[in-house]
A protein has these predicted regions:
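Divalent-metal coordination cores built from histidine and acidic residues
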Residues: 1-167
């Protein structure tokens, strides 16, 4: 089997349809569609490939999961820039539509907050925050920087937070 954890539906669909034809000599394919990011999208097509999509509000998140379900995704993948509210909306909508959830630990959350709500925690990036002796202080600092970010690339914001708090 092959699991694709981030790509735009319009680019994935032709390949997946070909691989899923009855006479295809191909592995089973499970796909999530785009990375579900927050107001700021890391993989926005600027300096990195466009494989993410914005979910700035709970309403956008709910609608996106319904659209992805109708597009035939096998699961969803939540990325790093979502707020706790959007994260909850995405996981609740996925549960409603019986879609498994893969996720990175969002920068706005800790592993202990996000982990219980997902089926697969990817790469364990950001898990170190929960392991630090000053976890609460580091988390508050991260939230302050996230909440004060007004515009710019999600990639830049994410990278600056990782650099700032690299352990």
């Amino acid at each position: 089997s092959v699991r694709d954890t981030g790509g735009l539906i319009n680019k994935l669909r032709p390949v997946i349809e070909k691989m899923r034809t009855p006479d295809a000599l191909a592995p089973r394919v499970f796909f999530s569609g785009p990375l579900l990011d927050g107001k700021f999208v890391v993989y926005d097509g600027g300096l990195v490939p466009e494989i993410g999509t914005q979910n700035a509000t709970v309403e956008m998140a709910n609608k996106k999961i319904e659209i992805l379900k109708n597009e035939g995704v096998d699961f969803i993948k939540i990325y790093e820039m979502v707020t706790p509210e959007v994260f909850s909306a995405l996981t609740e909508a996925a549960t409603k539509f019986k879609l498994p959830v893969a996720a990175h630990i969002p920068l706005s959350m800790t592993a202990s907050m996000a982990g219980p709500k997902v089926d697969s925690m990817e790469h364990l990036r950001n898990v170190e925050l929960d392991c630090a002796i000053n976890s609460a202080t580091l988390h508050e600092e991260r939230l302050s920087r996230l909440n004060s970010h007004i515009e710019g690339a999600g990639l830049t914001l994410r990278s600056s937070l990782h650099q700032l708090q690299r352990l």
